Curated annotation (Swiss-Prot):
Pfam families: RhoGAP. Its main location: cytoplasm. The record marks R100 as: Arginine finger. One of its GO terms (molecular function) is GTPase activator activity. Residues 7-50 have a biased composition (Basic and acidic residues). This is Rho GTPase-activating protein gacQ. The lineage of its organism: Eukaryota, Amoebozoa, Evosea, Eumycetozoa, Dictyostelia. Residues 67-255 form the Rho-GAP domain. One of its GO terms (cellular component) is plasma membrane. It comes from Dictyostelium discoideum.
Length: 531
Protein backbone atom coordinates (compact mmCIF):
# COMPACT_ATOMS: atom_id res chain seq x y z
CA UNK A 1 0.00 0.00 0.00
CA UNK A 2 2.82 2.34 0.88
CA UNK A 3 4.50 1.55 -2.38
CA UNK A 4 1.41 2.53 -4.37
CA UNK A 5 0.95 5.84 -2.57
CA UNK A 6 4.52 6.87 -3.36
CA UNK A 7 3.99 6.29 -7.06
CA UNK A 8 0.87 8.42 -7.10
CA UNK A 9 2.71 11.30 -5.43
CA UNK A 10 5.52 11.08 -7.93
CA UNK A 11 3.07 11.15 -10.79
CA UNK A 12 1.33 14.22 -9.41
CA UNK A 13 4.66 16.00 -9.01
CA UNK A 14 5.65 15.18 -12.57
CA UNK A 15 2.36 16.52 -13.87
CA UNK A 16 2.83 19.80 -12.02
CA UNK A 17 6.37 20.13 -13.36
CA UNK A 18 5.11 19.62 -16.90
CA UNK A 19 2.51 22.32 -16.42
CA UNK A 20 5.13 24.74 -15.19
CA UNK A 21 7.32 24.00 -18.19
CA UNK A 22 4.44 24.62 -20.57
CA UNK A 23 3.72 27.95 -18.95
CA UNK A 24 7.35 28.98 -19.27
CA UNK A 25 7.35 28.04 -22.94
CA UNK A 26 4.23 30.08 -23.60
CA UNK A 27 5.73 33.08 -21.86
CA UNK A 28 8.92 32.79 -23.91
CA UNK A 29 6.97 32.52 -27.16
CA UNK A 30 4.97 35.61 -26.30
CA UNK A 31 8.14 37.50 -25.61
CA UNK A 32 9.58 36.41 -28.94
CA UNK A 33 6.46 37.52 -30.78
CA UNK A 34 6.53 40.86 -29.11
CA UNK A 35 10.15 41.32 -30.08
CA UNK A 36 9.42 40.39 -33.69
CA UNK A 37 6.52 42.82 -33.92
CA UNK A 38 8.68 45.56 -32.45
CA UNK A 39 11.44 44.79 -34.92
CA UNK A 40 9.00 44.89 -37.83
CA UNK A 41 7.71 48.26 -36.80
CA UNK A 42 11.23 49.58 -36.53
CA UNK A 43 12.11 48.19 -39.96
CA UNK A 44 9.02 49.73 -41.52
CA UNK A 45 9.85 53.10 -40.07
CA UNK A 46 13.40 52.80 -41.34
CA UNK A 47 12.15 51.84 -44.83
CA UNK A 48 9.82 54.80 -44.90
CA UNK A 49 12.65 57.12 -44.03
CA UNK A 50 14.83 55.53 -46.69
CA UNK A 51 12.12 55.81 -49.32
CA UNK A 52 11.61 59.46 -48.53
CA UNK A 53 15.32 60.07 -48.88
CA UNK A 54 15.47 58.08 -52.10
CA UNK A 55 12.55 59.99 -53.55
CA UNK A 56 14.22 63.25 -52.73
CA UNK A 57 17.39 62.04 -54.38
CA UNK A 58 15.50 60.76 -57.43
CA UNK A 59 13.73 64.06 -57.83
CA UNK A 60 17.07 65.75 -58.05
CA UNK A 61 18.27 63.19 -60.67
CA UNK A 62 16.56 63.39 -64.09
CA UNK A 63 15.30 60.21 -65.69
CA UNK A 64 16.90 59.41 -69.02
CA UNK A 65 14.31 57.01 -70.47
CA UNK A 66 10.75 58.28 -70.45
CA UNK A 67 11.83 61.82 -69.66
CA UNK A 68 12.07 64.91 -71.80
CA UNK A 69 14.78 66.80 -73.61
CA UNK A 70 16.77 69.40 -71.64
CA UNK A 71 15.87 73.05 -71.42
CA UNK A 72 15.49 75.01 -74.62
CA UNK A 73 18.65 77.09 -74.30
CA UNK A 74 20.96 74.37 -72.95
CA UNK A 75 24.06 73.84 -75.07
CA UNK A 76 25.23 70.34 -74.11
CA UNK A 77 23.72 67.34 -75.85
CA UNK A 78 22.43 64.36 -73.80
CA UNK A 79 25.19 61.91 -72.86
CA UNK A 80 23.28 58.91 -74.16
CA UNK A 81 23.05 60.50 -77.62
CA UNK A 82 26.74 61.32 -77.74
CA UNK A 83 27.89 57.90 -76.46
CA UNK A 84 25.61 55.80 -78.68
CA UNK A 85 26.25 57.78 -81.87
CA UNK A 86 30.03 57.85 -81.30
CA UNK A 87 30.00 54.09 -80.75
CA UNK A 88 27.90 53.45 -83.88
CA UNK A 89 30.17 55.62 -86.00
CA UNK A 90 33.05 53.31 -85.05
CA UNK A 91 31.37 49.88 -85.04
CA UNK A 92 27.93 50.23 -86.65
CA UNK A 93 28.29 51.93 -90.03
CA UNK A 94 29.20 48.70 -91.82
CA UNK A 95 27.05 46.25 -89.85
CA UNK A 96 24.26 44.94 -92.10
CA UNK A 97 20.72 45.70 -90.97
CA UNK A 98 21.67 48.42 -88.48
CA UNK A 99 18.52 49.99 -86.88
CA UNK A 100 16.47 47.19 -88.47
CA UNK A 101 17.56 44.21 -86.36
CA UNK A 102 17.04 44.31 -82.58
CA UNK A 103 19.56 43.40 -79.88
CA UNK A 104 19.09 41.22 -76.80
CA UNK A 105 16.52 42.53 -74.32
CA UNK A 106 18.57 41.61 -71.22
CA UNK A 107 21.54 43.72 -72.27
CA UNK A 108 19.26 46.60 -73.29
CA UNK A 109 17.56 46.61 -69.86
CA UNK A 110 20.91 46.51 -68.05
CA UNK A 111 22.13 49.56 -70.00
CA UNK A 112 18.85 51.35 -69.31
CA UNK A 113 19.21 50.84 -65.57
CA UNK A 114 22.77 52.17 -65.70
CA UNK A 115 21.67 55.33 -67.50
CA UNK A 116 18.69 55.88 -65.19
CA UNK A 117 20.88 55.52 -62.08
CA UNK A 118 23.52 57.85 -63.52
CA UNK A 119 26.25 55.23 -63.59
CA UNK A 120 29.11 54.92 -66.10
CA UNK A 121 28.45 52.78 -69.18
CA UNK A 122 30.98 50.98 -71.35
CA UNK A 123 29.89 49.25 -74.57
CA UNK A 124 31.82 46.23 -75.91
CA UNK A 125 32.77 46.37 -79.61
CA UNK A 126 30.43 43.55 -80.75
CA UNK A 127 27.04 44.99 -79.64
CA UNK A 128 26.14 47.37 -82.46
CA UNK A 129 22.52 46.19 -82.70
CA UNK A 130 22.07 46.55 -78.92
CA UNK A 131 23.34 50.14 -78.95
CA UNK A 132 21.22 51.01 -82.00
CA UNK A 133 18.06 49.64 -80.37
CA UNK A 134 18.99 51.52 -77.15
CA UNK A 135 19.16 54.79 -79.12
CA UNK A 136 15.80 54.09 -80.77
CA UNK A 137 14.22 53.30 -77.38
CA UNK A 138 15.50 56.58 -75.91
CA UNK A 139 14.05 58.64 -78.77
CA UNK A 140 10.80 56.68 -78.85
CA UNK A 141 10.10 56.99 -75.09
CA UNK A 142 10.51 60.75 -74.87
CA UNK A 143 7.45 62.52 -73.46
CA UNK A 144 7.49 64.95 -76.36
CA UNK A 145 9.08 63.58 -79.56
CA UNK A 146 11.92 65.28 -81.34
CA UNK A 147 9.50 66.51 -84.04
CA UNK A 148 6.84 67.74 -81.64
CA UNK A 149 3.16 66.85 -81.69
CA UNK A 150 2.27 70.33 -82.94
CA UNK A 151 4.39 69.89 -86.08
CA UNK A 152 3.23 66.38 -86.96
CA UNK A 153 0.56 67.52 -89.44
CA UNK A 154 3.00 70.00 -90.99
CA UNK A 155 5.52 67.26 -91.79
CA UNK A 156 2.74 65.08 -93.22
CA UNK A 157 1.59 68.01 -95.39
CA UNK A 158 5.12 68.50 -96.73
CA UNK A 159 5.15 64.92 -97.97
CA UNK A 160 2.09 65.46 -100.18
CA UNK A 161 3.90 68.07 -102.35
CA UNK A 162 5.24 66.73 -105.65
CA UNK A 163 7.66 69.56 -106.45
CA UNK A 164 10.96 68.81 -104.70
CA UNK A 165 12.10 72.44 -104.43
CA UNK A 166 8.86 73.56 -102.83
CA UNK A 167 8.99 70.58 -100.48
CA UNK A 168 12.51 71.46 -99.31
CA UNK A 169 11.51 75.07 -98.67
CA UNK A 170 8.55 73.95 -96.59
CA UNK A 171 10.71 71.50 -94.62
CA UNK A 172 13.11 74.32 -93.82
CA UNK A 173 10.21 76.42 -92.52
CA UNK A 174 8.80 73.59 -90.41
CA UNK A 175 12.20 72.73 -88.89
CA UNK A 176 12.79 76.43 -88.19
CA UNK A 177 9.57 76.44 -86.12
CA UNK A 178 10.87 73.65 -83.84
CA UNK A 179 12.41 74.54 -80.45
CA UNK A 180 16.12 75.46 -80.67
CA UNK A 181 17.39 72.42 -78.77
CA UNK A 182 15.25 70.08 -80.91
CA UNK A 183 16.79 71.59 -84.02
CA UNK A 184 20.26 71.03 -82.62
CA UNK A 185 19.59 67.39 -81.74
CA UNK A 186 17.91 66.81 -85.11
CA UNK A 187 20.94 68.13 -86.98
CA UNK A 188 23.27 65.91 -84.91
CA UNK A 189 21.19 62.78 -85.60
CA UNK A 190 20.73 63.42 -89.32
CA UNK A 191 24.43 64.07 -89.81
CA UNK A 192 25.05 60.56 -88.45
CA UNK A 193 22.24 59.04 -90.55
CA UNK A 194 23.76 60.61 -93.65
CA UNK A 195 26.91 58.57 -93.00
CA UNK A 196 24.78 55.44 -92.61
CA UNK A 197 23.23 56.07 -96.03
CA UNK A 198 26.68 56.56 -97.57
CA UNK A 199 27.53 52.98 -96.50
CA UNK A 200 24.22 51.54 -97.74
CA UNK A 201 26.05 49.17 -100.10
CA UNK A 202 27.34 47.29 -97.04
CA UNK A 203 24.70 47.83 -94.35
CA UNK A 204 21.72 47.66 -96.81
CA UNK A 205 20.04 50.71 -95.19
CA UNK A 206 18.73 53.09 -97.85
CA UNK A 207 16.85 56.33 -97.06
CA UNK A 208 13.52 54.61 -97.68
CA UNK A 209 14.45 51.80 -95.25
CA UNK A 210 15.48 54.36 -92.61
CA UNK A 211 12.19 56.22 -93.05
CA UNK A 212 10.33 52.99 -92.26
CA UNK A 213 12.52 51.98 -89.29
CA UNK A 214 13.87 55.18 -87.75
CA UNK A 215 11.34 57.91 -88.61
CA UNK A 216 8.54 56.70 -86.23
CA UNK A 217 10.91 57.21 -83.28
CA UNK A 218 11.26 60.92 -84.16
CA UNK A 219 7.85 61.73 -85.65
CA UNK A 220 4.69 60.35 -84.06
CA UNK A 221 1.15 61.66 -83.44
CA UNK A 222 -0.32 62.42 -80.06
CA UNK A 223 -2.26 59.41 -78.74
CA UNK A 224 -3.27 57.91 -75.41
CA UNK A 225 -2.21 54.29 -75.93
CA UNK A 226 0.46 52.44 -77.86
CA UNK A 227 -2.18 50.81 -80.06
CA UNK A 228 -3.39 54.19 -81.25
CA UNK A 229 0.18 55.23 -82.02
CA UNK A 230 0.69 52.05 -84.06
CA UNK A 231 -2.56 52.64 -85.90
CA UNK A 232 -1.60 56.21 -86.81
CA UNK A 233 1.89 55.22 -87.89
CA UNK A 234 0.55 52.44 -90.12
CA UNK A 235 -1.98 54.81 -91.71
CA UNK A 236 0.63 57.53 -92.29
CA UNK A 237 3.44 55.19 -93.36
CA UNK A 238 2.57 55.72 -97.03
CA UNK A 239 2.61 59.50 -96.68
CA UNK A 240 5.97 59.52 -94.80
CA UNK A 241 7.70 57.02 -97.06
CA UNK A 242 10.00 59.52 -98.81
CA UNK A 243 10.18 62.17 -96.08
CA UNK A 244 13.44 60.87 -94.63
CA UNK A 245 15.03 60.58 -98.06
CA UNK A 246 14.12 64.16 -99.00
CA UNK A 247 15.68 65.43 -95.74
CA UNK A 248 18.85 63.33 -96.09
CA UNK A 249 19.42 64.11 -99.77
CA UNK A 250 18.99 67.86 -99.10
CA UNK A 251 20.87 67.90 -95.77
CA UNK A 252 23.25 70.72 -96.71
CA UNK A 253 20.47 72.95 -98.00
CA UNK A 254 18.29 72.42 -94.92
CA UNK A 255 20.67 72.27 -91.95
CA UNK A 256 23.58 74.36 -93.23
CA UNK A 257 21.37 77.42 -93.60
CA UNK A 258 22.74 80.13 -91.23
CA UNK A 259 19.24 81.48 -90.58
CA UNK A 260 18.11 78.14 -89.16
CA UNK A 261 19.78 78.52 -85.75
CA UNK A 262 19.36 82.26 -85.28
CA UNK A 263 17.08 83.27 -82.37
CA UNK A 264 13.68 84.34 -83.58
CA UNK A 265 12.20 87.70 -82.59
CA UNK A 266 8.92 88.12 -80.76
CA UNK A 267 7.17 89.30 -83.89
CA UNK A 268 8.35 86.24 -85.81
CA UNK A 269 7.15 83.98 -83.01
CA UNK A 270 3.77 85.70 -82.87
CA UNK A 271 3.24 85.53 -86.63
CA UNK A 272 1.95 82.32 -88.11
CA UNK A 273 3.92 82.59 -91.33
CA UNK A 274 3.65 78.88 -92.09
CA UNK A 275 1.35 78.81 -95.09
CA UNK A 276 1.81 75.99 -97.57
CA UNK A 277 2.65 77.68 -100.90
CA UNK A 278 1.17 76.09 -104.00
CA UNK A 279 3.34 73.96 -106.22
CA UNK A 280 4.66 75.26 -109.51
CA UNK A 281 2.05 73.45 -111.55
CA UNK A 282 -0.83 74.68 -109.45
CA UNK A 283 0.46 78.24 -109.39
CA UNK A 284 0.80 78.46 -113.16
CA UNK A 285 -2.57 76.92 -113.74
CA UNK A 286 -4.27 79.27 -111.28
CA UNK A 287 -2.61 82.36 -112.76
CA UNK A 288 -3.56 81.35 -116.30
CA UNK A 289 -7.09 80.64 -115.17
CA UNK A 290 -7.43 84.05 -113.55
CA UNK A 291 -5.92 85.81 -116.54
CA UNK A 292 -8.32 84.07 -118.92
CA UNK A 293 -11.39 85.28 -117.01
CA UNK A 294 -13.24 88.32 -118.30
CA UNK A 295 -13.28 91.36 -116.04
CA UNK A 296 -16.38 91.43 -113.90
CA UNK A 297 -18.46 94.54 -114.29
CA UNK A 298 -19.74 96.44 -111.26
CA UNK A 299 -22.99 95.12 -109.90
CA UNK A 300 -26.22 96.82 -110.81
CA UNK A 301 -28.60 98.08 -108.13
CA UNK A 302 -30.72 95.70 -106.10
CA UNK A 303 -33.42 94.03 -108.13
CA UNK A 304 -31.78 94.63 -111.51
CA UNK A 305 -30.13 92.13 -113.78
CA UNK A 306 -26.32 92.13 -114.03
CA UNK A 307 -25.09 94.39 -116.81
CA UNK A 308 -21.75 93.28 -118.29
CA UNK A 309 -21.32 96.27 -120.59
CA UNK A 310 -21.00 98.87 -117.85
CA UNK A 311 -17.38 97.92 -117.11
CA UNK A 312 -16.16 98.80 -120.58
CA UNK A 313 -18.27 101.99 -120.69
CA UNK A 314 -17.10 103.24 -117.32
CA UNK A 315 -13.48 102.39 -118.11
CA UNK A 316 -13.66 104.49 -121.28
CA UNK A 317 -14.92 107.56 -119.43
CA UNK A 318 -12.32 110.07 -118.18
CA UNK A 319 -11.83 110.16 -114.41
CA UNK A 320 -13.38 113.09 -112.54
CA UNK A 321 -11.04 115.94 -111.62
CA UNK A 322 -9.53 115.76 -108.16
CA UNK A 323 -9.55 118.92 -106.10
CA UNK A 324 -6.24 119.98 -104.51
CA UNK A 325 -5.62 118.86 -100.95
CA UNK A 326 -5.87 121.67 -98.44
CA UNK A 327 -4.95 121.73 -94.80
CA UNK A 328 -7.87 121.69 -92.35
CA UNK A 329 -10.47 121.22 -95.08
CA UNK A 330 -14.07 120.19 -94.66
CA UNK A 331 -15.93 118.95 -97.74
CA UNK A 332 -19.65 118.63 -98.20
CA UNK A 333 -20.86 116.80 -101.31
CA UNK A 334 -24.45 116.78 -102.50
CA UNK A 335 -25.62 114.38 -105.21
CA UNK A 336 -29.11 114.80 -106.68
CA UNK A 337 -31.13 111.67 -107.39
CA UNK A 338 -30.16 110.17 -110.78
CA UNK A 339 -32.54 110.29 -113.72
CA UNK A 340 -32.41 107.12 -115.79
CA UNK A 341 -33.76 106.83 -119.32
CA UNK A 342 -33.65 103.54 -121.18
CA UNK A 343 -33.49 103.11 -124.94
CA UNK A 344 -32.39 100.47 -127.43
CA UNK A 345 -29.19 100.86 -129.42
CA UNK A 346 -28.35 99.32 -132.76
CA UNK A 347 -27.09 96.21 -131.00
CA UNK A 348 -30.43 95.77 -129.20
CA UNK A 349 -28.86 96.46 -125.80
CA UNK A 350 -30.09 98.91 -123.16
CA UNK A 351 -27.81 101.93 -123.26
CA UNK A 352 -26.85 104.13 -120.34
CA UNK A 353 -28.09 107.70 -120.43
CA UNK A 354 -25.52 110.30 -119.41
CA UNK A 355 -26.45 112.37 -116.39
CA UNK A 356 -24.61 115.51 -115.38
CA UNK A 357 -24.12 115.60 -111.62
CA UNK A 358 -22.79 118.71 -109.90
CA UNK A 359 -20.82 118.35 -106.72
CA UNK A 360 -20.22 121.42 -104.58
CA UNK A 361 -17.22 121.35 -102.27
CA UNK A 362 -16.77 124.03 -99.65
CA UNK A 363 -13.51 124.53 -97.78
CA UNK A 364 -13.04 126.68 -94.73
CA UNK A 365 -9.90 128.55 -95.84
CA UNK A 366 -11.24 129.54 -99.25
CA UNK A 367 -14.37 131.76 -99.24
CA UNK A 368 -15.52 130.81 -102.78
CA UNK A 369 -16.92 127.29 -103.31
CA UNK A 370 -15.56 125.26 -106.19
CA UNK A 371 -18.01 123.44 -108.46
CA UNK A 372 -17.03 120.46 -110.57
CA UNK A 373 -19.25 118.81 -113.19
CA UNK A 374 -18.87 115.09 -113.83
CA UNK A 375 -20.87 112.85 -116.12
CA UNK A 376 -21.82 109.36 -114.94
CA UNK A 377 -23.53 106.57 -116.81
CA UNK A 378 -25.86 104.70 -114.49
CA UNK A 379 -27.15 101.21 -115.22
CA UNK A 380 -30.91 100.67 -115.72
CA UNK A 381 -32.92 100.00 -112.60
CA UNK A 382 -35.53 97.82 -114.34
CA UNK A 383 -34.37 94.19 -114.72
CA UNK A 384 -36.58 93.57 -117.81
CA UNK A 385 -35.73 95.70 -120.88
CA UNK A 386 -38.56 97.82 -122.35
CA UNK A 387 -40.66 96.50 -125.19
CA UNK A 388 -39.34 97.51 -128.62
CA UNK A 389 -41.27 100.16 -130.58
CA UNK A 390 -42.57 99.83 -134.11
CA UNK A 391 -39.56 101.63 -135.55
CA UNK A 392 -37.14 99.25 -133.91
CA UNK A 393 -39.21 96.25 -135.10
CA UNK A 394 -39.18 97.52 -138.67
CA UNK A 395 -35.42 97.98 -138.49
CA UNK A 396 -34.75 94.53 -137.03
CA UNK A 397 -37.40 92.61 -139.05
CA UNK A 398 -38.04 94.43 -142.36
CA UNK A 399 -40.13 91.58 -143.85
CA UNK A 400 -42.85 91.65 -141.18
CA UNK A 401 -46.26 93.15 -142.16
CA UNK A 402 -47.43 96.36 -140.51
CA UNK A 403 -49.27 95.97 -137.21
CA UNK A 404 -53.04 96.11 -137.15
CA UNK A 405 -54.77 99.19 -135.82
CA UNK A 406 -57.33 97.37 -133.71
CA UNK A 407 -55.84 96.66 -130.27
CA UNK A 408 -58.16 93.71 -129.63
CA UNK A 409 -57.20 91.96 -132.86
CA UNK A 410 -53.56 92.70 -132.14
CA UNK A 411 -53.68 90.90 -128.82
CA UNK A 412 -55.77 87.92 -129.97
CA UNK A 413 -54.73 87.14 -133.57
CA UNK A 414 -51.32 86.63 -135.12
CA UNK A 415 -50.38 88.08 -138.54
CA UNK A 416 -50.57 85.67 -141.49
CA UNK A 417 -48.12 85.76 -144.38
CA UNK A 418 -49.09 85.52 -148.06
CA UNK A 419 -47.46 83.15 -150.52
CA UNK A 420 -45.46 85.99 -152.04
CA UNK A 421 -44.14 87.12 -148.69
CA UNK A 422 -43.32 83.50 -147.81
CA UNK A 423 -41.38 83.04 -151.04
CA UNK A 424 -39.50 86.26 -150.39
CA UNK A 425 -38.66 85.33 -146.80
CA UNK A 426 -37.97 81.65 -147.44
CA UNK A 427 -36.82 81.11 -151.05
CA UNK A 428 -35.82 77.50 -150.46
CA UNK A 429 -39.31 76.29 -149.47
CA UNK A 430 -41.11 73.84 -151.86
CA UNK A 431 -44.24 75.01 -153.76
CA UNK A 432 -47.54 74.76 -151.88
CA UNK A 433 -49.76 71.71 -152.31
CA UNK A 434 -53.07 72.06 -154.24
CA UNK A 435 -56.45 71.85 -152.55
CA UNK A 436 -58.13 68.48 -152.25
CA UNK A 437 -61.43 69.79 -153.54
CA UNK A 438 -59.88 70.87 -156.85
CA UNK A 439 -58.12 67.54 -157.47
CA UNK A 440 -59.73 64.80 -159.70
CA UNK A 441 -58.98 61.07 -159.91
CA UNK A 442 -57.75 59.75 -163.32
CA UNK A 443 -58.27 56.16 -164.64
CA UNK A 444 -55.37 53.79 -164.20
CA UNK A 445 -54.04 52.22 -167.43
CA UNK A 446 -51.56 49.33 -167.64
CA UNK A 447 -48.06 50.19 -168.70
CA UNK A 448 -45.85 48.11 -171.03
CA UNK A 449 -42.26 48.53 -172.08
CA UNK A 450 -41.11 48.70 -175.71
CA UNK A 451 -37.73 47.89 -177.12
CA UNK A 452 -36.84 51.57 -176.99
CA UNK A 453 -37.32 51.53 -173.18
CA UNK A 454 -40.29 53.91 -173.39
CA UNK A 455 -43.38 53.41 -171.30
CA UNK A 456 -46.62 53.18 -173.37
CA UNK A 457 -50.15 52.17 -172.36
CA UNK A 458 -51.31 48.85 -173.92
CA UNK A 459 -54.43 46.73 -173.87
CA UNK A 460 -54.43 43.27 -172.39
CA UNK A 461 -53.99 40.38 -174.97
CA UNK A 462 -54.87 36.69 -174.70
CA UNK A 463 -52.00 34.23 -174.76
CA UNK A 464 -52.21 30.47 -175.53
CA UNK A 465 -50.09 28.52 -173.06
CA UNK A 466 -49.00 25.07 -174.41
CA UNK A 467 -50.08 22.04 -172.30
CA UNK A 468 -47.62 20.04 -170.30
CA UNK A 469 -46.18 17.03 -172.10
CA UNK A 470 -46.12 13.61 -170.34
CA UNK A 471 -43.27 11.21 -171.07
CA UNK A 472 -44.17 7.90 -172.70
CA UNK A 473 -44.57 4.70 -170.73
CA UNK A 474 -41.56 2.47 -170.29
CA UNK A 475 -43.12 -0.85 -171.06
CA UNK A 476 -46.44 -2.50 -170.65
CA UNK A 477 -49.86 -1.42 -171.81
CA UNK A 478 -52.18 0.98 -170.24
CA UNK A 479 -54.25 -1.87 -168.95
CA UNK A 480 -51.38 -3.26 -166.94
CA UNK A 481 -50.71 0.09 -165.22
CA UNK A 482 -52.36 0.03 -161.79
CA UNK A 483 -52.40 3.83 -161.59
CA UNK A 484 -55.55 5.46 -162.89
CA UNK A 485 -55.21 7.99 -165.75
CA UNK A 486 -55.63 11.73 -165.29
CA UNK A 487 -58.49 13.92 -166.49
CA UNK A 488 -56.64 14.75 -169.71
CA UNK A 489 -56.46 10.98 -170.37
CA UNK A 490 -52.74 11.00 -169.83
CA UNK A 491 -50.98 8.27 -167.83
CA UNK A 492 -48.11 8.56 -165.39
CA UNK A 493 -44.83 6.68 -166.02
CA UNK A 494 -44.71 3.06 -164.82
CA UNK A 495 -42.16 2.23 -162.18
CA UNK A 496 -39.75 -0.67 -162.86
CA UNK A 497 -40.71 -4.02 -161.29
CA UNK A 498 -39.19 -5.05 -157.99
CA UNK A 499 -36.46 -7.71 -158.03
CA UNK A 500 -37.44 -11.17 -156.80
CA UNK A 501 -36.98 -11.57 -153.11
CA UNK A 502 -34.68 -14.28 -151.80
CA UNK A 503 -36.98 -16.29 -149.53
CA UNK A 504 -36.20 -19.58 -147.72
CA UNK A 505 -38.61 -22.49 -147.87
CA UNK A 506 -40.88 -22.84 -144.86
CA UNK A 507 -39.74 -25.11 -142.04
CA UNK A 508 -41.59 -28.37 -141.64
CA UNK A 509 -44.02 -28.58 -138.74
CA UNK A 510 -42.83 -31.16 -136.19
CA UNK A 511 -45.16 -34.08 -135.55
CA UNK A 512 -46.55 -34.61 -132.10
CA UNK A 513 -45.86 -38.19 -130.95
CA UNK A 514 -48.81 -40.27 -129.99
CA UNK A 515 -49.19 -42.25 -126.77
CA UNK A 516 -48.24 -45.54 -128.40
CA UNK A 517 -45.09 -44.11 -129.89
CA UNK A 518 -44.16 -42.61 -126.53
CA UNK A 519 -44.62 -46.01 -124.80
CA UNK A 520 -42.54 -47.77 -127.43
CA UNK A 521 -39.72 -45.30 -126.93
CA UNK A 522 -39.83 -45.85 -123.19
CA UNK A 523 -39.69 -49.63 -123.59
CA UNK A 524 -36.74 -49.38 -125.94
CA UNK A 525 -34.85 -47.26 -123.39
CA UNK A 526 -35.60 -49.67 -120.59
CA UNK A 527 -34.38 -52.61 -122.62
CA UNK A 528 -31.13 -50.93 -123.39
CA UNK A 529 -30.55 -50.16 -119.72
CA UNK A 530 -31.24 -53.71 -118.64
CA UNK A 531 -28.73 -55.07 -121.07
Amino acid sequence: MKFGKKKEKENLENIEKDKDRDKEKEIKEKEKKDKKSKDKKKNQEIEKDNNINNNNNNNNVKKVFGGSLPFLFEEELPTILVQTIDYLQLFGLQTPGIFRENGSLASIQSYRSLYDNDKPVNFPPHEAHVVASLLKAYLRELKVPLCTFEHYDMFIACESIADEKVKVELLKKVIAHLPPFNRKVMKYIFSFLQKVVENSNVNKMTPDALSIVFLPTILRPQANTDLEILQFTVEDSKSTKTLMSSILLNYDEIFEDPNLFQPRTRQARAQTDFVSPPSSQNSTSSSSYLSSKNPISPRSPIGSSPNFTTASILSALPPPPISPILSSNTTNTTLPPPIITSSIDDNNEPSLSPRIITTTTTTTPSPQPTTTTTTHRLPPSNPIPPTPTSNSQSQLYPNLPPPSSDPIIKSTTTPTLNSQSQSQLYPNLPPPLPDKNKCKLLPITPITTNESNTLQPTTPTSTNIPPLSIPPQIGGNSDSNPISPTKNQSQLPILPPKPPSLTLPPKPIPKIPTILEYENNVRQRSNTTMV
